[in-house]
């Protein structure tokens, strides 16, 4: 079963759907949850009365800045190694703001080059090439390829109206 609701208010319970009921087996529908009024929504999954998973979504503020996260801590200068640079639109508390729209522009300097940009939106026909990409769910990614020379790399992500983000890395 799943319990869901706003933190501090009454939780709604949803029993497991019957697998032989074609109408509802893959449907999750909740009633009486006051969406859109702010606060934190929590979902708790239970199996035989024991909690097995928990997830919480927080209401965010307005996007204020971009934030960069790197995937590869050990980046090799072999001309083939990739660095996945994740960029998020965040509020003043650092929370991702999924409703943020706009196009992020990337600037890369040093011992790497920008080879692709993506945002995870499967419904777009935008190309992966270029140095800019629209945010999707507050997210965009740049993919960098190292050169064959060890050295420093700098990437900057900017979006009009938000504070830019910059990250320095080293290839070895």
Regions found by a protein language model. Name each.
Residues 36-40, 80-82, 150-152:
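Extracellular Ig-like/FN3 beta-sandwich strand-entry sites
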């Amino acid at each position: 079963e799943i319990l869901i609701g706003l933190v501090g208010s009454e939780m709604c319970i949803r029993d497991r759907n019957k697998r032989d009921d074609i109408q509802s087996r893959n449907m999750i529908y909740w009633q009486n949850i006051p969406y859109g009024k702010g606060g934190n929504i929590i979902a708790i999954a239970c199996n035989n009365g024991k909690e097995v998973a928990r997830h919480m979504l927080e209401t965010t503020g307005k996007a204020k800045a971009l934030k960069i996260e790197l995937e590869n801590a050990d980046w090799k200068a072999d001309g083939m190694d990739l660095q996945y640079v994740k960029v998020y639109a965040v509020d003043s508390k650092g929370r991702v703001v999924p409703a943020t729209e706009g196009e992020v522009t990337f600037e890369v300097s040093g011992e790497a080059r920008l080879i692709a940009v993506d945002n995870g939106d499967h419904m777009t026909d935008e190309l992966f090439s270029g140095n800019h990409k629209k945010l999707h769910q507050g997210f965009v990614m740049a993919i960098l390829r190292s050169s064959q020379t060890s050295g420093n790399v700098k990437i900057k992500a900017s979006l009009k109206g938000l504070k830019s983000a910059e990250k320095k890395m080293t290839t070895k």
